[in-house]
Amino acid sequence: MWLMKEYRNKEVRDLMLLLLSLFWLWCTPVFHNICSVDDQNNFSTLLTILESTTISAVLSCASILCDCLISSALKDKLVGLFFMPRSGETIFSDIKNGQIKDSRFRTSDALSLYTGIMQKLPNEKAARREIENAEWYQIYQRYQEKGSVIQSQRDYLMCRDLFIETLAFLIVYILSVHIFPSVVCFSLKFLIVLFVLSIAFNICTHLKMSRFVTTVIW
């Protein structure tokens, strides 16, 4: 059986382990205390390790909880930064305007195949996007069990969830700096890593979403 979200047990888990490792290394005094440990501060070092471990667990759980509480629609809006439309909302307009670049099909063939849909698209932006997405979704329902569609959808959902997890970790880390100032240190390089990962995953999500949408219609 194909597990659409098996990546949550692999890629998402690996990402969380990476972020927690960097958090321990750069944002807590654990490693510094371990390197300078002696008989007189063994207890202090142990206490620091326990505090850092607890806070790491809190950050991890908070990130996962955020991901679970955020709806799929809100995730899509976050990916689009609240102003970029989903690919399914513009796919037929993009074909009509020659903005689709996909080596798997010619634009002229796609124009011929979906002429009926394009002819009934209204000029008003919101209504047009709603109709385009509805038409695309009807096509998706017919081919959702197709292997190439399943694979492209999995890739898209994986990148989207990696982006959301990184964004959630970024937010809870910033909060933890203010909530646990005695244990959590501000690290500019960790913040940069989180920002870079967020941007990279966002770009990947858009690329995979576009690939998924065009795979459905062809």
Feature-to-residue mapping (PLM):
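N-terminal first transmembrane alpha-helix
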Residues: M1-I100, C185-I192
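Cytosolic/matrix-facing juxtamembrane and C-terminal tails of multi-pass cellular membrane proteins
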Residues: M1-V12, C185, I199-W218
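Transmembrane alpha-helical segments and their cytosolic interface motifs
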Residues: K5-S21, Y140-L188
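Intrinsically disordered regions, especially transient/low-confidence alpha-helical propensity segments
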Residues: S21-F23, N133, T215
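Hydrophobic, lipid-facing residues on alpha-helical transmembrane segments of integral membrane proteins
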Residues: T54-I70, F163, L167, I171, ...
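Charge-rich cytosolic interhelical loops and cytosolic tails of multi-pass membrane proteins
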Residues: A73-G147
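Short, charged low-complexity linear motifs
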Residues: L121-N123, F195-S198
